[in-house]
Amino acid sequence: MKTLPITRYRFFQKIQPLSLLKKITGKTITGCLQVFSTSGTWSIYVEEGKLIYACYSERMFEPLYRHLGNLSPQIATLPKEINEQLRAIFETGIENQAIPNPDYLAICWLVNQKYISSSQAAVLIEQLALEVVESFLMLEEGSYEFIPESFLDDLPKFCYLNVRLLVEQCQQHGRVPEAFRREASSQEISSSTEHNQIPVNNRRSTKFTSPPHTQPKPEPRLPQINTNKSTEYSKRYASQPNTVNHGYSQTSATSTDKKIYTIFCIDENPIVLNNIKNFLDDQIFAVIGVTDSLKALMEILCTKPDIILINVDMPDLDGYELCSLLRKHSYFKNTPVIMVTEKAGLVDRARAKIVRASGHLTKPFNQGDLLKVIFKHIT
């Protein structure tokens, strides 16, 4: 991964948006360009120089709802009340939580629920990107930084957009200042074939159909969300360590193709367990919290959770020992086991690798950190 030679400017100054866009179009550039102004923040995510998503902080969901409304007549699987569902789950449900791009999670959810296809998600992302880039090109003053790692790194990607072609489309709409048009005119693609195919690397090329530069990615594998508000799932937490309810029960009928993912958490600190419970939407996850690692081993065998979070510093039976024991059981050879630790040095990573842990989560963590590791490992 290459770090851009872009200085981090903390103070507002005159900026040239087109020049910043040029700097992130190199084939080895991956990360997020964030540009700050008095009106809001622009976040432009790129992978190998191609734009994969763009958003504006002050209007994150409004454009999404609007473009979904425009697409709904063409998509029979998109329900009329979809905006209300998204608002309840991804706006109200995560209010005041540290998730950088809940709008992108909403798009992933739409694909996972089969409301839209990956190619339709690509069209949606391009329309949003055009709107964001257009407003970004109007910016005259601000500050910026480039972050090599971003929230989208471990999430599904639906398209790779050519930034220059996006700028050209903005010009065609006639809403880009003349100065930007003159500067961009020297970069126009002379060969018509480049409008139809853009190489990303030696193994992949981005071919365009409609829209002309959108490449759908494979269907993402993310947790499915049950939006039936009348459904309640019984969960056992650390405050009730002796009441074991294996699996979950439903108080009303729901569609059989909606799965609730069971997350088994082992930590001697009830506060940590409660934080995990509060971070995870109970319409997606059934959380089981245990403070005793010895009891946890037998209960894991009974509940067969979809993902396991283990504090490595548990007394009696530490996280590494517990993970090693689980891996010896045929059922748990491939179950995601995440080591939760306050330190993630080379020695700790090596120990986790020896016991075949799936990954690690460093304390303290926020909701965004937790969702990233779960979305990365759950199937």
Swiss-Prot record:
Subcellular location: Cell septum
Domain Response regulatory: residue ranges: 262-378
GO biological process: cellular response to nitrogen starvation; heterocyst development; phosphorelay signal transduction system
Stretches that traverse the bilayer: none
Alphabetically ordered keywords of this record: Heterocyst, Phosphoprotein, Two-component regulatory system
Inducing or repressing factors: By nitrogen starvation. Induction requires HetR. Transcription positively regulated by NtcA.
GO cellular component: cell septum
PROSITE patterns to which the protein is assigned, alphabetical: RESPONSE_REGULATORY
InterPro entries (UniProt xref): Bact_response_regulator (IPR050595), CheY-like_superfamily (IPR011006), PatA-like_N (IPR025497), Sig_transdc_resp-reg_PatA (IPR024186), Sig_transdc_resp-reg_receiver (IPR001789)
UniProt keyword annotation of Phosphoprotein present: yes
Primary role: Controls heterocyst pattern formation. Required for the differentiation of intercalary heterocysts but not for terminal heterocysts.
Protein name listed in UniProt: Protein PatA
